[in-house]
Every structure is written in C-alpha cells, then in structure tokens.
UniProtKB/Swiss-Prot annotation:
One of its GO terms (cellular component) is cytosol. Catalyzes the synthesis of GMP from XMP. Pfam families: GATase, GMP_synt_C, NAD_synthase. It comes from Haemophilus influenzae (strain 86-028NP). It catalyses: XMP + L-glutamine + ATP + H2O = GMP + L-glutamate + AMP + diphosphate + 2 H(+). Keywords: ATP-binding, Glutamine amidotransferase, GMP biosynthesis, Ligase, Nucleotide-binding, Purine biosynthesis. It comes from the Bacteria. Pathway: Purine metabolism; GMP biosynthesis; GMP from XMP (L-Gln route): step 1/1. Residues 8-205 form the Glutamine amidotransferase type-1 domain. The gene is guaA. Its EC number is 6.3.5.2. This is GMP synthase [glutamine-hydrolyzing]. Residues 206-398 form the GMPS ATP-PPase domain. PANTHER family: GMP SYNTHASE [GLUTAMINE-HYDROLYZING] (PTHR11922:SF2), GMP SYNTHASE-RELATED (PTHR11922). InterPro entries: Class_I_gatase-like (IPR029062), GATASE (IPR017926), GMP_synth_C (IPR001674), GMP_synth_GATase (IPR004739), GMP_synthase (IPR022955), GMPS_ATP_PPase_dom (IPR025777), NAD/GMP_synthase (IPR022310), Rossmann-like_a/b/a_fold (IPR014729).
Length: 523
C-alpha cells in the first residue's frame, strides 16, 4: 500500500489569516502537510520528521520585543525552509539579518523583479522582458528585511521593498515577502510546487484514491471485527465517513439517521434512498420531529435553540445506540479545520468564532472509542473523496446547511407550520437558482422565515400572511461575503411562485446585507 505520509511538510502558524490556505495548496500539489502553532518543541519536530518546513505570515511585527519566533531547531534540522511574509522576516532576524518597519506599507498587487537565479523561481515569470523577468504577486506587509543574513542573496525586489525575496541555496532556505498561497499571486502554486516537489523532493502521493485506500486500511486496523455506530445526517462529511466505513467493515456499520423535522423538503426520503437503497448501508431512520419541536416550543433565543437541538440529538442518538448492544465505536465526521480550531480554543493561540459540534460533542457516559476517518482532511478534499466513492456531484457540491437546520432559519420560536412553509419556499428558490444557472455561481443560498405578518392582495380579497426573506451570497472563504446580484427577473419569478404556490406567504424580500456587518445566516 502507498505510504501517503512518507513525505510531509510542516507548516508553522504565526497567526496569518492565510495559513490554512498554505496547507490546502500543499495538499493540492499532492503532498501531505500539517499545520502547527509556531511554538512547537524540537522533540515534536523531530518526531514528525518533516521533509520541509514552511513559516507562515502573521499580523504581528518582528520589530516588537515579544513577537513570535520560529524554534531554533527549524534552521538546524537539515531540511529546506520557506518563510512567507512574516516567516521570511523572522527567518532573516533569527539568522543574523535585520528587519524594520517600512515607510511604505504594501497591501495588494505588486510586481516583483527577479534577480540572481534561485531554485524557488525556476521556470517562473509573468510579464518578463529579455532583461528583467517579473512575478505578479499579492503583498500584505508593514515590515521589511533591510539587511540579509550571512550567505543569503536577494532574489526579488520591488521599488518600495528592495529585499522582496531572498535565498541561501546551500542550506535551502528561502524567503518571500509576498503570499504565494493566494490566487492573486498568479504563479503561486507553481512556486510552492518548486519548493515542495523540486527542492524538498516530496513525491505527490496525496491523491483521492490513495487517501481512500489508506483510510479503509486504518479503519480495519483500528476497529477489527467490532461494530461501529454513525450519526448520518446526509451532509457531505457524514456521508463520506459512512461510505469509507461501509467499504472497510460492511454490515458492522450501523448508521442512525435522526429526522428532526428541521430538514429541507423531502431530504429524509432522499437520504434513505441514497444510502439505504443505492449504497446498501445498514441504516435506521428515527422520526423525532415531535420530540425536537416539543423541546423547542416557546423558545426564541438563537443560542438556546442551538443548544436544545444539540442536546435532543444526543438524547435520541443515545436511545438508539442502547438498542445496539455490541457497538464498541462511534464514528464522527470531524475534519481538519475542526481539529485546528478546537486545538486553538484550548491553547488560546487563535480566535475561534464558533465551537464545532463534531469535536467533543457527545457526553462522557457514552463510553465508545472514536473513529474519525476525515480528521486529516480539508473540506475540498472530503468532496473529492466523496466523488471518488460514487456520491453524486449535485450532493457533494450542495450549499452549506447549518447543523441546527431550519431551527435557525425560522426566526424566533420554531413551529411545524413555519417549518413546512419555509421548506416549500426554499425548495422553489433553489429550484429556480438551479434552472437559471445561478446555483453554481452563488456560494450559499437559502430562505428565511420571518415571524411577522404582512398584508397582501389575492384576487378580490386581502390576506394577512407571513414573510419570507431570500438570501444568496458569494464568498471564497465564508469569512467575508458579498450579497449575490441576482437578476431582477429571476427574483421576480421566485417571489411570484412562492406567493402563489405556498399558501400562507404574502410577501417575499431579498437580503442585500454583506458580511460584515451582517453574518451569512440570520441566527
């Protein structure tokens, strides 16, 4: 079997907003990598045995006395090192160079003139002339290196940053003041490929097929002939976990699908058809709508609703697990960003917006071993694996759906009547987005039920019914988002269909708030 972890890159995180993007680019190249906080020990690095090390950017300044530094062992480990932005600055300082606060802060596009050949820039240029090859890059820095460490040479320069890139070819140390991991740097992926493949010598074994083979083998080794239980929601993560486990242990996997009454139109039936009928999984559907809605009755606070939905899910799941007396393992769809954020919340090294339900979400009394086949994977990698396992593209590429479901898209108190109206309105919106080709152009689109009534006119009569808000956004990372400029005729068609086809809705509005200041979800 292919050893997909044989060659690996260690990325030390100094707090940059782009650090996870570095890891995703390295994985995209086909090489395994892990992202660790900057203050790791020499022993931890030795045990990980990286083939190369990347130092990330940071919002900190190297000119500040207590700003973070790379462990000294990084530069004594006899492996190539690439410093990006702050990573280049701390490399320079720690090896005897000098950094200063720049008179001209650089944020945005820049053109770096390349000089003195370096393996890092081999066969790279964007707008070269015979005398001066250049790279179009993305800068984001306020400090700069003003004196090189011994044995380094300048390999890139801009008018305001004379040392925009540097290298020590003998020790294979490289620094770039720009960000190769962002798409704005046109040749960024090629530059990282030069470092990871050509300089570090990593083989590109991190592929969907190899990851599946490795995951199946590890599951078999971990659980043997034991039985495993999985809460299958129909979302991408739990679906991929289910298929990996099914491939590894077959009928020893017990999937529990909790139908909480807060799902999209016909979603419960679709989950059963997909995983029960098509893939032949051992799956139990639990109709818990009345239990969830009963607990939510009279509750309007969003955070309280989230906690109730989470608690009831655990209770229902626990009731089902007790019926399976031979189960020894619990499978979860934890993915790598969950692990990173959970670790950060414990160490205080990063600001975490929300805790994830997949990390440590079940009570201590459920004394089962944990199986987490996706723990090393980013979301885009999970999708690729899902496609390779046979999940339909329409399902894999579906827009995100919140864990509490319609519980946080019905504003205020959640009632069955409201959920039923919202389900039908949302189905019309998504159907028209797909028919018009706009579903793929938006990152997330959904409907929200507003608990206010509005006067409308139907025929010769007046009606006093509920309001639906439509929401569609475009985003790269969901940290910021722009409202999608959907065509007026499309919005008009959706509005007319909802008001005419969903009895109980009298008005449809479109949310044109960006993030920030608004969040993507209303609750």
């Amino acid at each position: 079997m292919t050893n997909i972890h044989n060659h690996k890159i260690l990325i030390l995180d100094f707090g940059s907003q782009y650090t996870q993007l570095i890891a995703r680019r390295v994985r995209e190249i086909g090489v395994y990598c892990e992202l660790w906080a900057w203050d790791v020990t020499e022993q931890q690095i030795r045990e990980f045995a990286p083939t190369g090390i990347i130092l990330s950017g940071s919002p900190e300044s190297t000119t500040e006395e207590n700003s973070p530094r790379a462990p000294e062992y990084v530069f004594n480990a006899s492996v190539p090192v690439l410093g990006i932005c702050y990573g280049m600055q701390t490399m320079a300082m720690q090896l005897g160079g000098l950094t200063e606060t720049s008179d001209h802060r650089e944020f945005g596009y820049a053109s770096v003139s390349l000089e003195n050949s370096t393996a890092l820039f081999a066969n790279l240029n964007d707008n070269s002339t015979a005398s001066e090859p250049k790279l179009d890059v993305w800068m984001s820095h306020g400090d700069k290196v003003t004196r090189l460490p011994e044995n380094f040479k300048v390999t890139g320069t801009t008018p305001t940053c004379p040392i925009a890139a540097m290298s020590d070819e003998n020790r294979r140390f490289y620094g770039v003041q720009f960000h190769p991991e962002v798409t704005h740097t046109k040749k960024g992926l090629e530059l990282l490929t030069n470092f990871v493949v050509n300089i570090c010598g990593c083989e590109t074994k991190w592929t969907a097929e190899n990851i599946i083979e490795d995951a199946v083998a590890r599951i078999k080794e971990q659980v043997g002939d034991d039985e495993v239980i999985l809460g299958l929601s129909g979302g991408v993560d739990s679906s991929v976990v289910a298929l990996l486990l099914h491939r590894a242990i077959g009928k020893n996997l017990h999937c529990v699908f909790v139908d909480n009454g807060l799902l999209r139109l016909h979603e419960g039936d679709q989950v059963m058809e997909m995983f029960g009928d098509k893939f032949g999984l051992n799956i139990t559907r639990v109709d818990a709508e009345s239990r969830f809605l009963g607990e939510l009755a009279g509750v309007s606070d969003p955070e309280a609703k989230r906690k109730i939905i989470g608690k009831v899910f655990v209770d229902v799941f626990d009731d089902e697990s007790k019926k399976l007396t031979n189960v020894k393992w619990l499978a979860q769809g934890t993915i790598y960003p969950d692990v990173i954020e959970s670790a950060a919340s414990k160490t205080g090294k990063a600001h975490v917006i929300k805790s994830h339900h997949n990390v440590g979400g079940l009570p201590d009394y459920m004394k089962l071993g944990l199986v987490e086949p996706l723990r090393e994977l980013f979301k885009d990698e999970v999708r690729k694996i899902g496609l390779a396992l046979g999940l339909p593209a329409e399902m894999i590429n579906r827009h995100p759906f919140p864990g509490p479901g319609l519980g946080v898209r019905v504003l205020g108190e959640v009632k069955k009547e409201y959920c039923d109206l919202l389900r039908r309105a949302d189905a019309i919106f998504i159907e028209e987005l797909r028919n018009s080709g706009w579903y793929e152009k938006t990152s997330q689109a959904f409907s929200v039920f507003l608990p206010v009534k509005s006067v409308g006119v139907m025929g010769d009569g007046r009606k006093y019914d509920w309001v639906i808000s439509l929401r569609a956004v475009e985003t790269i990372d969901f940290m910021t988002a722009h409202w999608a400029h959907l065509p007026y005729d499309l919005l008009g068609k959706v509005s007319n269909r909802i008001i005419n086809e969903v009895n109980g809705i009298s008005r449809v509005v479109y949310d044109i708030s960006g993030k920030p200041p608004a969040t993507i979800e209303w609750e």
